[in-house]
């Protein structure tokens, strides 16, 4: 009884077979079919290689949410060279809460030579070229995010020559921690001193003819310092054409959380608008000579996550490629063969075999016998 039930079960399973086997003796091969098969296998191989390269690649996913962190401090990373001696300039930050952050809290004043060496000029040229490409091709920013901590540092390389020229500039570099409110980082004449109504700079002690706010921004970023990330103002160089010249940068800072397979960092992106003008009180152009970077923080936070195609999706796409090519090439081969047979007059519903002679009862023969099924009487 068990054997009978087992046979019935096997018979039922065989009837459900969706892949019936055709005996090889019933299969007819042809040159056209072999050619189509070669084309199909070649196409499948190429598409499989391309699909595998897509599977190995990653992409960046952007998500937006409201920034709810108001209590933490904002870090400003600075590396600026000004074409004035260090004793003549001062840098500090003053925010909307009238909180002053002095440069002594984290900035270093280092005498330097404003003109770059040949190697440094080449570095600056490449950085400016990269900046121009980033402004045209925004998708390159994803490549920069993925290459963080893997690419070479974007910092200005040290001078390779021992220049005998005396320092004529001041390199101000380091970092400051400020409140997460709008503020103004500025470099102007004279050291800053606090007073009840804000702060002031001792500009009266500096000769007006020594004013020169030509400057080069080697690096400016907000948040955690991430090597190999190129920021909008990196490599910027401005040459002053007048002693009383003001350079203004209006910066909008966007908090950014970066999560890749290599790093995870809380940093900030920013956009900038530049403006420069000559101070002339007689002409109505009021202000103070110097470099002013006015920043404001966006209320939105961006989360950038590196993602990868899951294996199951890669497998499904691969099956789709193989099955689709087999079905499509088989259908196209059948249609093509059908058309060729019609054009060449080889398509026929039956088989025609001519009969040389058919004898009649009276002894005559007729060589023109009409077509009969199987040519039989």
From Swiss-Prot:
Localization, UniProt: Endoplasmic reticulum-Golgi intermediate compartment membrane; Golgi apparatus, cis-Golgi network membrane; Endoplasmic reticulum membrane; Cytoplasm
Family of this protein: Belongs to the ERGIC family.
UniProt topological domain (Lumenal) ranges: 55-319
Gene Ontology cellular-component annotations: COPII-coated ER to Golgi transport vesicle; endoplasmic reticulum membrane; endoplasmic reticulum-Golgi intermediate compartment membrane; Golgi apparatus; nucleus
Main location: endoplasmic reticulum
Record-level GO BP terms: endoplasmic reticulum to Golgi vesicle-mediated transport; retrograde vesicle-mediated transport, Golgi to endoplasmic reticulum
One Pfam family from the record: COPIIcoated_ERV
Highest taxon listed in the record's lineage: Eukaryota
Gene (name only): ERGIC2
Cytoplasmic-side positions: 1-33, 341-377
Database matches in InterPro entries: Erv (IPR045888), Erv_C (IPR012936), Erv_N (IPR039542)
Role played: Possible role in transport between endoplasmic reticulum and Golgi.
TM regions (residue ranges): 34-54, 320-340
Membrane-topology descriptor: Multi-pass membrane protein
Keyword set, alphabetical order: Cytoplasm, Endoplasmic reticulum, ER-Golgi transport, Golgi apparatus, Membrane, Nucleus, Transmembrane, Transmembrane helix, Transport
Name of the protein in question: Endoplasmic reticulum-Golgi intermediate compartment protein 2
């Amino acid at each position: 009884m068990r054997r009978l039930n087992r046979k019935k079960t096997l018979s039922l399973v065989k009837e459900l077979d969706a892949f019936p086997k055709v005996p090889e003796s019933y299969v007819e091969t042809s040159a056209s079919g072999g050619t189509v098969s070669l084309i199909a296998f070649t196409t499948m191989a190429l598409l499989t290689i391309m699909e595998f390269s897509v599977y190995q690649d990653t992409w960046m996913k952007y998500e937006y949410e409201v920034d709810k962190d108001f209590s933490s401090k904002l870090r400003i990373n600075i590396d600026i060279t000004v074409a004035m001696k260090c004793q003549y300039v001062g840098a500090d930050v003053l925010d909307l809460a009238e909180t002053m952050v002095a440069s002594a809290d984290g900035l270093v004043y280092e005498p330097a030579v404003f003109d770059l060496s040949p190697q440094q000029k080449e570095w600056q040229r490449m950085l400016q070229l990269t900046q121009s490409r980033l402004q045209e091709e925004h998708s390159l920013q994803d490549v920069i995010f993925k290459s963080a901590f893997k690419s070479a540092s974007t910092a200005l390389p040290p001078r390779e020559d021992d220049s005998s020229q005396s320092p004529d500039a001041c390199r101000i570099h380091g970092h400051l921690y400020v409140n997460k409110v709008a503020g103004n980082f500025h470099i102007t004449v004279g050291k800053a001193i606090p007073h009840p109504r804000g702060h002031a700079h001792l500009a009266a002690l500096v000769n007006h003819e020594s004013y020169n706010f030509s400057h080069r921004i080697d690096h400016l970023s907000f948040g955690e310092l991430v090597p190999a990330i190129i920021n909008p103002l990196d490599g910027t160089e401005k040459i002053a054409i007048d002693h009383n010249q003001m350079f203004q940068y209006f910066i909008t800072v966007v908090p950014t959380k970066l999560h890749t397979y290599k790093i995870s960092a809380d940093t900030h992106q920013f956009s900038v608008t530049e403006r420069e003008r000559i101070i002339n009180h007689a002409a109505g152009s009021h202000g103070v000579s110097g470099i002013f970077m006015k920043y404001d923080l966006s209320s939105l936070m961006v989360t950038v996550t590196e993602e990868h195609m899951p294996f199951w999706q890669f497998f499904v796409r691969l099956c789709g490629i193989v099955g689709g090519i087999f079905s499509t090439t088989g259908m196209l081969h059948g249609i093509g063969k059908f058309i060729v047979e019609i054009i060449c007059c080889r398509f026929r519903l039956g088989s025609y075999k001519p009969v040389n002679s058919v004898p009649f009862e009276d002894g005559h023969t007729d060589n023109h016998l009409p077509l009969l099924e199987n040519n039989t009487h």
